[in-house]
Swiss-Prot record:
Forms an icosahedral capsid composed of 60 subunits, arranged as a dodecamer of pentamers. Belongs to the DMRL synthase family. This is 6,7-dimethyl-8-ribityllumazine synthase. Pfam families: DMRL_synthase. It comes from Vibrio cholerae serotype O1 (strain ATCC 39315 / El Tor Inaba N16961). It comes from the Bacteria. (2S)-2-hydroxy-3-oxobutyl phosphate binds at residues 86-87, 128.
Amino acid sequence: MKVIEGGFPAPNAKIAIVISRFNSFINESLLSGAIDTLKRHGQISDDNITVVRCPGAVELPLVAQRVAKTGDYDAIVSLGCVIRGGTPHFDYVCSEMNKGLAQVSLEFSIPVAFGVLTVDTIDQAIERAGTKAGNKGAEAALSALEMINVLSEIDS
């Protein structure tokens, strides 16, 4: 039986991180976690990491699509934070963003790791940005690294 698994080191990989500015006090912690993980676990140098900022979570799929279209990157890590408010806006933003990022991944055959917090409260966001519940930016970076290696193994 053949089992294909990917590790984390990918020293020659080029990674784009697309990150929304809205809720930046949370997003910057996610970004720090992602970059640290790419460097430590992926052994990726600063020269192979590009950070692209956009206004909000709804814009992430378009930015990810443009990045993927260049063909310059091996994976994209999407980061952001959407906090539920008192209107249905949260549901629309989260749904469309998630669908859009998945579509980019399939359309361009590139890993698009999901590191966007979709939470009910600011406390939940803080917990997931590097305190009690780990750092979801770091977890998304690990997912991107593993997917680069899994796809490489499948293609070889």
